[in-house]
Structures are given as C-alpha cells and as structure tokens.
C-alpha cells in the first residue's frame, strides 16, 4: 500500500493526518524563529483583558503567510490535497491565519470549526514543537463522520496531537477538537491555512498582498461584558 493511500485512509477514518518532517530546510527554521519573535513583540503590546482567560488569540501572519506557504507548496503537497479533497489546489481560496495559545488555566470545550454540511480543509504548519506541556490540540478521531450532539461527543476517545517543527497537521473543519491548557508558561504558536472552495474563476490566495503581522480580536471583547462571558465560558463550557 502506498504512503498516499495510507494517508487518505487515515484521513477518511480519523478526520486528520499528521505528515511528519514535511518541511525541512534552514530557511524555514529561520522564518519560524523570526515569526515567533515578531508575534511575541505584538503580544507584549496588547492589553490582555479580552482573551486573557481563554488564552487563545488569532494571528494574521502577514508577510510570513506567503513565505511559509512557498516552503509548503510542493508537488507532493498538491497531490496530497488533491487526494483528500478530490480537487486541485487551484479550486480553493486559501486563507492564512494562526493561533497563539497562552491559556494557562483551562482547556477549551470541544467544538468544530464549521457546520457539519459546510466543511473545509485546515492545514496547520507546525512552526515550533508542540508537546504535552504547551497546549497541544486535542482531537476526537472519527467524529467528522456524522452529525453528533455535544453529549455524545464528550464520551468519545480523544488524542492529543504532539508534533515537531516542520510537521503538517491536515484536518477537516467538522472534526471535533479543542485547545488544551498550556502549562509551559510560554505562548505557543500554530499557523493555519484554510482551504475553502473558491468563489471566483480562479482560487484566490488571500495572503499574496498581506504585509503586516497582526494579532486579531479574540472571541471575547476587552470590555466588562466580554470578561463576564469569558469567565462563564471557561468555567461552565459544558453548558455553553
């Protein structure tokens, strides 16, 4: 059985695959270090009230989006995407983003990133090692296959995704997952490219002109109402 067939089978069965050591060059290592440095510089400028409890902030990687995508976008990668999605890369609008996990207190509750019938692919590029202590993504393998109520989801067996710099995590948006708490006390970054079916004639690569790295607003706003909602969400997420 070829690697490609095995990867496809694993993706269909579990809703995600991990491609180990996919990007390996000195330039990538340099980019990752510089990216993290710039993210932390922005992070340190923030008023950390909103998102401080959730501890997950969305990142727009700016100029790094394109540079890292160039390292990723090999013939092998195109074939893998085509195998999984049954579509060519040019059929997608590709949107770049990322997540900074500085959640030192709570796990998120399990959720999906899309409605069941409206799924898309998410490719996470691992730009720094992810281990047990720094808030790995926790997935519920196989939960992408059918529409599940939340009470059924929480009885499924979970798996934490530990990964090394240069690994890729490809998952479907309707796989149930959550961010876990980062007890390393160092904010941990994970980049993401979202592959949505294109709207125009040709696939749009949104990050072509995206120059400035930004930390975006979190789920909750930096105001009293947002803080109350956030408190409720983190402590009683099973009700939410």
Model-derived features with residue positions:
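Non-heme Fe(II)/2-oxoglutarate
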Residues: 175, 180-240
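Conserved metal-binding segment of the jelly-roll/cupin
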Residues: 163-177
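Glycine-rich nucleotide phosphate-binding loop and flanking beta-alpha elements
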Residues: 25, 116, 176-177
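Non-heme Fe(II)-dependent double-stranded beta-helix
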Residues: 1-13, 20-110
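Active-site lining segments that contact anionic ligands and/or coordinate catalytic metals
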Residues: 158, 165, 186-190
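Catalytic core of non-heme Fe(II) oxygenases with the double-stranded beta-helix
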Residues: 103-162, 200-209
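A structural signal for short, well-ordered beta-strand segments
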Residues: 94-96, 123-125, 191-195
